[in-house]
Amino acid sequence: MNAKIVVLPGDGIGPEVTAEAVRVLEAVARRGGHALSFTERLMGGCSIDAHGTALTPEVLADCQAADAVLLGAVGGPKWDDPRAKVRPEQGLLGLRKGLGVFANLRPVRVHPSLLDSSPLRPEKLRGVDIMVIRELTGGLYFGQPKGRDVKDGHARAVDTLEYQDFEVRRVVELAFRIAKGRKKKVTSVDKANVLESSRLWRELATAIGQANPDVALDHMLVDTAAMRLVTSPATLDVVVTENMFGDILTDEASVLAGSMGMLPSASIGEQGPGLYEPIHGSAPDIAGKGIANPVGTVLSAALLLRHSLGLEPEAAAIERAVDQTITDGCRTADLGGKLSTRAMADEILKRLA
């Protein structure tokens, strides 16, 4: 297979972890006889410094023309002024919109060797294997009208929570397709006791559930879901929810694994390139020290192979190598170990079958 991958290292530790993920992808490609080409481009704070914008039209066009996009991280204190007109995160939102991705997939699996690394008791974590699917293009983050003004002498801010039926259907249908390859259970999270948009969401999810009787569907209010994630996470399989709820719940779920550096994500649409990135931030406090955990980015590369290139054996090989590396006791600083970013990737490469 020939494939073009755009790499957006971004800010902070982004360049360090993406470099190791590219090494792993190159190794897998050599073994499988695939020709993967990698092109690096600027996005985020580094792009603001160089071009005055977080995402240039040229970089977006390159990403749209690629087979997949691998992202490191964006943002940092240098650009962290909420009053700024240009912020690194705008690049990420623009990229998602430009690529047409509508669903963010975040697998959360607790490795048996890392049960003691989580703030939760080990007995609550055994068997945790969750796929959280977050809708990406609707809701409060994109609804209009949006803005600030003065009304009756008082400052006012407005955000709009809006969903159209097709936006809900496509992400819930994706959740059911994914569930059929797992434990055949979907939990749809909403706030239908208060929000009209959540009532529409629940109605549509119910209809999709009726059309897929082989998959169990249950509805859960978002506050209950937040509690379930820390009281009995092993009871959850595929969780699907709207944009802001998903943003919050996925960050909560990330602590289950013991370190945010362990977890990958994939943002996919109906067609076109997917966007793959670790869930952690730019971690400016450790940037340049060579101690960041590359596992989340390496596992994001595995998702890239699976969802954008259709290379399931190669994706599974990376995941097995990561599992064995963790089982063998290899750890970066976030997990109480001493391995550098490069050394951790070296250990993964040694175990690639």
Swiss-Prot record:
Q: Does the keyword Amino-acid biosynthesis apply?
A: yes
Cofactor: binding comment: Binds 1 Mg(2+) or Mn(2+) ion per subunit.
Record keywords? Amino-acid biosynthesis, Branched-chain amino acid biosynthesis, Cytoplasm, Leucine biosynthesis, Magnesium, Manganese, Metal-binding, NAD, Oxidoreductase
Question: Where does this protein chiefly localize?
Answer: cytoplasm
The biological processes this protein is annotated with in GO are:
L-leucine biosynthetic process
Q: Where in the cell is it found?
A: Cytoplasm
Q: What class of enzyme is it?
A: oxidoreductase
Residues noted as binding NAD(+) in the record, renumbered to the chain: 76-89, 281-293
Any one GO molecular-function label of the UniProt entry: magnesium ion binding
The pathway it acts in is:
Amino-acid biosynthesis; L-leucine biosynthesis; L-leucine from 3-methyl-2-oxobutanoate: step 3/4
Q: Which GO terms describe its cellular component?
A: cytosol
Query: Which Pfam families does the record match to this protein?
Result: Iso_dh
Q: Which residues bind substrate?
A: 96, 106, 134, 223
Catalytic activity line of the entry: (2R,3S)-3-isopropylmalate + NAD(+) = 4-methyl-2-oxopentanoate + CO2 + NADH
Important for catalysis, annotated site positions: 141, 191
EC number(s): the record gives: 1.1.1.85
Binding, Mg(2+): 223, 247, 251
List the Gene3D superfamilies: Isopropylmalate Dehydrogenase (3.40.718.10)
Q: Which metal ions or organic cofactors does this protein require, according to UniProt?
A: Mg(2+); Mn(2+)
Subunit and interaction comment: Homodimer.
Family listed: Belongs to the isocitrate and isopropylmalate dehydrogenases family. LeuB type 1 subfamily.
- Briefly state the protein's biological role: Catalyzes the oxidation of 3-carboxy-2-hydroxy-4-methylpentanoate (3-isopropylmalate) to 3-carboxy-4-methyl-2-oxopentanoate. The product decarboxylates to 4-methyl-2 oxopentanoate.
The name under which this protein is listed is 3-isopropylmalate dehydrogenase
Organism encoding this protein? Anaeromyxobacter dehalogenans (strain 2CP-C)
The taxonomy runs: Bacteria, Pseudomonadati, Myxococcota, Myxococcia, Myxococcales
Q: State the gene name recorded for this protein.
A: leuB
